[in-house]
């Protein structure tokens, strides 16, 4: 059976056909509409899936935000242009006339990355550092989603009580500091208004402020990982996302994590499936996991 997998992120929408063998084909992308209106996202999703839906027997969605009863509830609306709520499953069933499931994107990616691990691993945490910071937790070989879909939203744990206000309403969240949006928001002077990609480029060219912003993000993530180790005693942490997979970033996180006491050290791995983990995880869950 072929799954039409969809990944909804703060920057882009992706879709692909994934067979029972896990092979990805006909992958497509569109920019995520920066709009508060549900119609904008519906129209973008329609354009994304219309060339693919005739070749699939079901739909699996991995989306940013809390997924509850098939709907997207934005924990940080800024990541979706201010959109607060969207009926994901209902919309895709109407667009495709196919059975549809939905799950948080980082939870889906965690499940895909867990399948790729070697050895006897039952406890792992996945962290995505991208437009926002999200996560997924596998414990006892099972993916944790929680009764309300909130499990794994580790980007909204406290990093700095005097830090910036996060889009979720809290102050000093990891996401407000370490994410691509957080990196860009802290830029000043000639870097003011630059996006995270530009800041990484400037850091590679030796720009001191850009380097400091990236170090601030990596240091914040390392402290989060130490907290995660203390909370879950996980065997490894897998890092993905456009920031998490940026050249040199994971090495910086490892450097800062090494400065923590030894009890909080844990193996860090780059995401095996890179930017396709959410698509694959959603398809895998559609094949047999009860959500």
Curated annotation (Swiss-Prot):
Catalysed reactions, as listed in the record: an N-acyl-D-mannosamine + ATP = an N-acyl-D-mannosamine 6-phosphate + ADP + H(+)
* One matching Pfam family: ROK
Enzyme Commission number, as recorded: 2.7.1.60
> Has UniProt tagged this entry with the keyword Nucleotide-binding?
yes
Residues reported in the UniProt entry to bind ATP: 5-12, 132-139
Its pathway, per UniProt, is: Amino-sugar metabolism; N-acetylneuraminate degradation; D-fructose 6-phosphate from N-acetylneuraminate: step 2/5
InterPro entries in the record: ATPase_NBD, ManNAc_kinase_bac, ROK, ROK_cs
Provide this UniProt record's keywords sorted from A to Z. ATP-binding, Carbohydrate metabolism, Kinase, Metal-binding, Nucleotide-binding, Transferase, Zinc
> From what superkingdom does this record's organism come?
Bacteria
- Positions with a binding annotation for Zn(2+): 156, 166, 168, 173
**Which Gene3D superfamilies does its entry note?**
3.30.420.40
PROSITE patterns attached to this UniProt entry? ROK (PS01125)
Any one GO BP annotation for this protein: N-acetylneuraminate catabolic process
Query: Is the Endoplasmic reticulum keyword given for this protein?
Result: no
Q: Which GO terms describe its molecular function?
A: ATP binding; N-acylmannosamine kinase activity; zinc ion binding
Primary role = Catalyzes the phosphorylation of N-acetylmannosamine (ManNAc) to ManNAc-6-P.
Stated family: Belongs to the ROK (NagC/XylR) family. NanK subfamily.
How does this polypeptide assemble, per the annotation? Homodimer.
UniProt-listed PANTHER family: N-ACETYLMANNOSAMINE KINASE, ROK (REPRESSOR, ORF, KINASE) FAMILY
Protein name per Swiss-Prot or TrEMBL: N-acetylmannosamine kinase
Q: Which gene encodes it?
A: nanK
């Amino acid at each position: 059976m072929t799954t039409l997998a969809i990944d909804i992120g703060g920057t882009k929408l992706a879709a692909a056909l994934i067979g029972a063998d896990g092979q990805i084909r006909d992958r497509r992308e569109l920019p995520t509409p920066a709009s508060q209106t549900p119609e904008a996202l519906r129209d973008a999703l329609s354009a994304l899936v219309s060339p693919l839906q005739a070749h699939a027997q079901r739909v699996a969605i991995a989306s940013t935000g809390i997924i509850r009863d098939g709907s997207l509830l934005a924990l940080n609306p800024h990541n979706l242009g201010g959109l607060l709520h969207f009926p994901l499953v209902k919309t895709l069933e109407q667009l495709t006339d196919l059975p549809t499931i939905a799950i948080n994107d980082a939870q889906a990616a965690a499940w895909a990355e867990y399948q790729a691990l070697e050895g006897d691993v039952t406890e792992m945490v996945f962290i995505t550092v991208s437009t926002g910071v999200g996560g997924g937790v596998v414990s006892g070989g099972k993916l944790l989603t929680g009764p309300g879909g909130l499990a794994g939203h580790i980007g909204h744990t406290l990093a700095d009580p005097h830090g910036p206000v996060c889009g979720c309403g809290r102050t000093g969240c990891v996401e407000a500091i370490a994410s691509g949006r957080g990196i860009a928001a802290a830029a000043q002077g000639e870097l003011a208004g630059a996006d995270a990609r530009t800041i990484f480029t400037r850091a590679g060219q030796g720009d001191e402020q850009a380097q400091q912003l990236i170090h601030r993000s990596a240091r914040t993530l390392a402290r989060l990982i130490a907290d995660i180790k203390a909370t879950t005693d996980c065997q490894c942490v897998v890092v993905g996302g456009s920031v998490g997979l940026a050249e040199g970033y994971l090495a910086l996180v490892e450097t800062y994590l090494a400065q923590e006491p030894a009890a909080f050290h844990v193996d860090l791995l780059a995401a095996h499936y890179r930017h396709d983990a959410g698509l694959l995880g959603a398809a895998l869950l559609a094949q047999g996991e009860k959500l």
